[in-house]
């Protein structure tokens, strides 16, 4: 019994190793036989623990020594005992025969993937390693190339100095453009007449409200005028219209005495009378009253000069005919008749009639 404990058999050691490999948690102490000295025997007895299956399997399968000694046949020839302080390292016993344990699948898989990766890496075609661009990338490259070409072209072009002639031309163009803008606003100026009674009123461009200004000027033919300004928006043309509504029909037999009658201010009375009445009288009434006064004075002058009563009767008949034939349409013939005798006075202007109501005209 003592001999079996000192020198265990091969089968017992093999069973112990298999049991320890299956269940590594169980720790079992086993004495080891060292050299002849007793000190080395005590140091060689160590408690052996099984740490991990992998380490145990790697240490279990190793080279086997060939020794004829029965005492050292269980241990390998490469067994070493290193005593360094209290730590003692010794090689584990190696078994004869192949291992029946199954290899791990994880190790095989890792080796397979490593070999495959190396094969793929060696067979990789480096010529195909070209970056592929989609349409967006190509467009971006084209725009970048165009910008670079433009920038290089701008750098190559020398900057031309500003010539004084070009500055003068730009200055003149700016002046003409300002003049064209100012010419859009049309201003109305009154025309000069030979008589002193004319009073024209002109509205400036600063007036923002449309207004009507009336002025009456009585000359030998009792002409009245009216300025009427229409104010439009700021960007449009401003216009002014002058109206001459009231005129008198003068017969062809116009003498110097009759001209004196108009120059004395008799024709102006009818106009003033209409203004005092509030402008309610019509143009026809004013014209008829004016013609009656004119014919009466004309008859009196003919009686004094000639002394024929029959001529007065004829003039009365003519007076009735003139009053009967008088109408608003006859007033428009004044300028045609007056231009024969007084071309200097009325030749510069043409009348414009807006209404037949004297209250609005005068």
UniProtKB/Swiss-Prot annotation:
GO cellular component terms, A-Z: plasma membrane
Keyword Cell membrane: yes
Main localization (coarse): membrane
Listed Acidic residues bias regions: 309-324
Biased composition (Low complexity): 63-78
Entry keyword set: Auxin signaling pathway, Cell membrane, Membrane, Transport
Region feature Disordered, mapped onto this chain: 22-113, 132-168, 303-327
Protein name: Protein BIG GRAIN 1-like D
Organism of provenance: Arabidopsis thaliana (Mouse-ear cress)
